[in-house]
Amino acid sequence: MATPITSRTETLQKYLKLDQKGMIMAEYVWVDADGGTRSKSRTLPEKEYKPEDLPVWNFDGSSTNQAPGDNSDVYLRPCAVYPDPFRGSPNIIVLAECWNADGTPNKYNFRHDCVKVMDTYADDEPLFGLEQEYTLLGSDNRPYGWPAGGFPAPQGEYYCGVGTGKVVQRDIVEAHYKACLYAGIQISGTNAEVMPAQWEYQVGPCTGIAMGDQLWISRFFLHRVAEEFGAKVSLHPKPIAGDWNGGLHSNFSTKAMREEGGMKVIEEALKKLEPHHVECIAEYGEDNELRLTGRHETGSIDSFSWGVANRGTSIRVPRETAAKGYGYFEDRRPASNADPYRVTKVLLQFSMA
């Protein structure tokens, strides 16, 4: 097996400190056809940039399965800008939407339709908080810390665990946390999950389209950090067979839900969501049927359910929300590999329509 090549950070530092002569590096990031991120860099004059100030760029869409070879140019339209935690100030990370040459959004540009829904219900002040679970793999595609050819002890000591034998690769988690904070991502926490080598971080609360933007950039950061440590990141909802899975639990509320009497508004929203269960599942990630079995703190993929403090349902209403009579609810159906634009779009649209 080849030895993974990790970043030589101490060697890189002397180059990162070099004067850039009034120029900056802008890393354009986009979502590809496979639900991953791609990026490439360009040089720009140093100044403060808003998305509308940045040039539209392009890439070879035939190499990312986003365009045919005979019409391969896909355009990158900047939509959000963040400080670059890898190169440092004044360099920037640019999140971009993908557009076709004829002026239509690319097939895999799910942000475009999400913006429309967010704008429609902007007066309702929708807030989202997403819980991203992921698994760290070695070069052999096995979870870090697992015995060769075998399985670890049953879950129980790993969730929020501390100490050797309970958690692995905490350095990646810490580095990713700091990178998000530096870039202004509204990361709100992190914890070890129920499977060794599985972790979770939370982003939010965020308003409207900022939720999808920030989660995608946080995923990009996670892969970049893991790259430096020679690790792979899996967002698969069932990374390995057993009593564990990966979700993107999605917390949601509107202004009316957060005010006195909001519990009634939540119940009305859940009634509206129920008939759209199949449509939601179609937007909630790949291979989700392996995860939503009705076991291991999941609801069944075949039916819609909700309950107070019940993690075995489609929707969980927190105990505190039920007790106070207002707050938020958690959609537990999205898989860990779900596109946050697709999730937040249908969650808002179907609970309000």
Swiss-Prot record:
SUPFAM superfamilies: Glutamine synthetase, N-terminal domain, Glutamine synthetase/guanido kinase. Its main location: cytoplasm. SMART domains: Gln-synt_C. It catalyses: L-glutamate + NH4(+) + ATP = L-glutamine + ADP + phosphate + H(+). InterPro entries: Gln_synt_N, Gln_synt_N_sf, Gln_synth/guanido_kin_cat_dom, Gln_synth_cat_dom, Gln_synth_N_conserv_site, Glutamine_Synthetase. Gene3D superfamilies: Glutamine synthetase, N-terminal domain, Glutamine synthetase/guanido kinase, catalytic domain. Its EC number is 6.3.1.2. It is an enzyme of class 6 (ligase). GO terms for biological process: glutamine biosynthetic process. PROSITE patterns: GLNA_1 (PS00180), GS_BETA_GRASP (PS51986), GS_CATALYTIC (PS51987). It comes from the Eukaryota. One of its GO terms (cellular component) is cytoplasm. Pfam families: Gln-synt_C, Gln-synt_N. Keywords: ATP-binding, Cytoplasm, Ligase, Nucleotide-binding. Residues 24-103 form the GS beta-grasp domain. It is found in: Cytoplasm. Residues 110-353 form the GS catalytic domain. One of its GO terms (molecular function) is glutamine synthetase activity. Belongs to the glutamine synthetase family. PANTHER family: GLUTAMINE SYNTHETASE, GLUTAMINE SYNTHETASE 2 CYTOPLASMIC. Homooctamer. This is Glutamine synthetase.
